[in-house]
From Swiss-Prot:
Keywords assigned: GTP-binding, Hydrolase, Lyase, Magnesium, Manganese, Metal-binding, Multifunctional enzyme, Nucleotide-binding, Riboflavin biosynthesis, Zinc
Organism: Staphylococcus haemolyticus (strain JCSC1435)
Residues annotated as binding GTP: 249-253, 270, 291-293, 313, 348, 353
PANTHER family to which the protein is assigned, alphabetical: 3,4-DIHYDROXY-2-BUTANONE 4-PHOSPHATE SYNTHASE, GTP CYCLOHYDROLASE II-RELATED
Full protein name: Riboflavin biosynthesis protein RibBA
Keyword hit for Nucleotide-binding: yes
Sites where the protein binds Mg(2+) 1: 28
Cofactor(s) this protein requires: Mg(2+); Mn(2+); Zn(2+)
Enzyme Commission identifier(s): 4.1.99.12, 3.5.4.25
GO terms of biological process kind: riboflavin biosynthetic process
Residue numbers annotated as active site: 325 (proton acceptor), 327 (nucleophile)
Binding site for Mg(2+) 2: 28, 142
Stretches the record annotates as DHBP synthase: 1-200
Species lineage: Bacteria, Bacillati, Bacillota, Bacilli, Bacillales
Length: 393
């Protein structure tokens, strides 16, 4: 499909236009019409009802929901995607509440500073949805996309969305969405592109502590960071003053390898090799909580069970329902930005780390391989990393 740049979509929204926002194929894999409440024109909701044909909802921030005492529609939300519906509403000035103009009045009242909870009748014909506070960086839904887009256009944190259905009542996807885009002259973006746009703008790590850390491989400084998005704790082991081009090892936590010296992998040996290199040449190790390439400790142990039954490290993850590698390097890039590191000599054998850093604006100027000895227990694992995952070993 042909997608537009986020900046072009923002400009369209500020002109009062609707845009199409497409989510991931592993999620709903659908397109929603999205408009910003503050900027939408008088025909927006009528267009959504006539051409979109889906349920018209009003994504809002948590603060707006609290302001108007909009409580969850149900006590126990069993929606497959966790969509946070509140009780439906009509503005007191509307007639039946269902007309496009009544729903437009209700939506606009949600961003009126003078509106009060008493101005809304419940239930009604407009369905507010409460967005997660960290937007698409926390939940990749159309609800969060609409509120994030509103904020990016400097508008009140509220929007209007409607699923796009075909004339036969089926959901529009793929080529059907592209045809809809061209038929109506709309901009179309993906939630994935909005996530990346937000990550580029995000400063979500905060330094919490800094201490001296003597180790078997030299004396370092250890920095403790916290992600404001996930509340994860990240440590950085550093030697010397940060440089514009820095020696950097991005190491994914491996309890079994780093702590218990498991011979199933090469993680512990790579960490020790990196510490020796950084102690001699200066630089930093960013230690990310990405156990099992992002699937977590217990799932990694479950993957080991499958490996004992004949799977390799890639097919085991796939058999458990995960991608082969779930890691993202947004937080690593944020930490490098904190230290004003613009480019790196990356201590790694993994090309995906080069791509992951580049995606967030960090240039990989050079690479230093980390070569460690194989053993009888990790030979197949190392071979799979080389052949299936493209590791340069």
């Amino acid at each position: 499909m042909e997608f537009d740049e986020i900046k072009d979509a923002l400009n369209a929204l500020k002109r009062g236009e609707s845009i199409i926002v497409v989510d991931d194929e592993d999620r709903e894999n659908e397109g929603d019409l999205v408009a910003i409440t503050q900027w939408m024109n008088d025909n927006t909701i009528n267009f959504m009802a006539k051409e979109g044909r889906g349920l018209i909802c009003a994504p809002i921030s948590k603060d707006l929901a609290l302001k108007f005492n909009l409580m969850p529609m149900v006590e126990h939300n069993t929606d497959g995607f966790g969509t946070n519906f509140t009780v439906s509403i009509d503005h007191a000035t509307t007639s039946t509440g269902i007309s496009a103009f009544d729903r437009m009045a209700t939506a606009r009242a949600l961003i009126n500073p003078e509106s009060t909870p008493e101005d809304f009748h419940k239930p009604g014909h407009l369905f507010p949805l409460i967005a997660k506070e960290n937007g698409v960086l926390e939940r990749t839904g159309h609800t969060e996309a609409a509120v994030d887009l509103a904020k990016l256009t400097k508008a009140a944190p509220a929007g209007v969305i409607c699923e796009i259905m075909n004339e036969d009542g089926t959901m529009a996807k793929g080529e059907q969405l592209e045809a809809f885009k061209h038929q109506h002259g709309l901009k179309m973006i993906t939630i994935e592109s909005l996530v990346n746009y937000q990550k580029d703008k995000d400063t979500s790590v905060e330094l919490k502590a800094k201490v001296n850390m003597p180790t078997d491989h030299g004396a370092f400084e250890m920095y403790g960071f916290e992600s404001s998005l996930t509340k994860e704790e990240i440590v950085v082991l550093a030697k010397g003053e940060p440089r514009v081009t820095e020696n950097v090892r991005i190491h994914s936590a491996c309890l079994t390898g780093d702590i218990f010296h498991s011979q199933r992998c090469d993680c512990g040996a790579q960490l020790e090799s990196a510490m020796k290199y950084i102690n001699e040449h200066g630089g930093m190790i960013i230690y990310l909580p990405q156990e099992g390439r992002g699937i977590g400790l217990i799932n990694k142990l479950r993957a080991y069970e499958l490996i004992e039954q004949g799977h390799d490290t890639v097919t085991a993850n796939l058999a458990l329902g995960f991608d082969e590698d779930l890691r993202d390097y947004h937080i690593a890039a944020q930490i490098l930005n904190y230290f004003n590191v613009q480019q790196v000599n990356l201590l790694s054998n993994n090309p995906k780390k080069f791509e992951g850093l580049s995606e967030y604006g960090i240039k990989v100027a050079d690479r230093t391989p980390i070569i460690v000895a194989e053993n009888e227990h990790n030979h197949d694992y190392m071979n799979t990393k080389k052949i299936k995952m493209g590791h340069l070993i």
